[in-house]
Amino acid sequence: MSSGNYQQSEALSKPTFSEEQASALVESVFGLKVSKVRPLPSYDDQNFHVYVSKTKDGPTEYVLKISNTKASKNPDLIEVQNHIIMFLKAAGFPTASVCHTKGDNTASLVSVDSGSEIKSYLVRLLTYLPGRPIAELPVSPQLLYEIGKLAAKLDKTLQRFHHPKLSSLHRENFIWNLKNVPLLEKYLYALGQNRNREIVEHVIHLFKEEVMTKLSHFRECINHGDLNDHNILIESSKSASGNAEYQVSGILDFGDMSYGYYVFEVAITIMYMMIESKSPIQVGGHVLAGFESITPLTAVEKGALFLLVCSRFCQSLVMAAYSCQLYPENKDYLMVTAKTGWKHLQQMFDMGQKAVEEIWFETAKSYESGISM
């Protein structure tokens, strides 16, 4: 498929439901009386914050998720995601509750006549989780440690998850799976010809030479794959000393889940925690310490971490530039990572792998002695 045709098909896939249509969907599919809806930002799906009329014992706030046409063609994957959300909630993780349709399913396929064709979209309803995205707050080393720990616990817990359609998480050409970094090559035109593109091309080259050859040595698991600073919610409480303490109150967006490796999860988490940090290079050590308190990395995994973090920066930055060409009206949301991401990636390259690793690994080691840096 040519890039032109590919762009067009991708552009058509994002849902464009109005607030009135979203409200009608909730009432017809889930049987709830809607009092108000408001759109929420989303990368390539459509989300709405839904308020319903007070019921005797049910929640009054939900998130309506409308999958794009491409994702809607894979109902098995959506079903597995829903069951993972329910499984993690039962295991004590702060995930949403999945609402059942009037037909007692966890999702429903709705068809819409767009005039030129009929499009089908999978719709789901999840309970709305309280809290603020950590992107809105300065994150302490202790919270970074807890987020690293959470990422490892999540992956480890999912080793116990079973489902007859689990194979749907083997997403071979999924652009957001970290092992598919070489697939970025067909989107590089979105960057133009500049220094940023040169860095990305260099990262892809190193990835092919130094990561692809080591994949068989990494330990496999199911990855959340998108523990970014907008998908982790936190709430504050007062400590005994009167200071504010923050706890994770919500984990959002399981749409990028796939089979991967433990080291992928920690690399992705480190990269996203760097985005808003005033000391981005320091972040990795605290996240790594938390992760390794549950799942210590092997020497081979540790050796790949620097390049994997760089690779995730490249995935996010390239796909944001590409998506901005498709959805210019969504530019503010799509370019959140780019505001600081290019600068952080450049800094990592300027410092070099050895210097960055030294900071990360020394910081992580300091937790073992009880004196965190």
Curated annotation (Swiss-Prot):
Q: Which residues form the active site?
A: 226 (proton acceptor)
Q: What is its EC number?
A: 2.7.1.81
User: Which InterPro entries does its entry note?
Assistant: Aminoglycoside_PTrfase, Kinase-like_dom_sf, Pseudomonas-type_ThrB
Q: Name one GO biological process term.
A: lysine catabolic process
Q: Which GO terms describe its cellular component?
A: mitochondrial matrix
Q: Top-level EC class, please?
A: transferase
Reactions accelerated catalytically: (5R)-5-hydroxy-L-lysine + GTP = (5R)-5-phosphooxy-L-lysine + GDP + H(+)
Quote the function comment for this protein. Answer: Catalyzes the GTP-dependent phosphorylation of 5-hydroxy-L-lysine.
Name of the featured protein? Hydroxylysine kinase
Q: Which organism is this protein's natural source?
A: Homo sapiens (Human)
| Taxon lineage | Eukaryota, Metazoa, Chordata, Craniata, Vertebrata
What is the name of the gene encoding this protein? HYKK
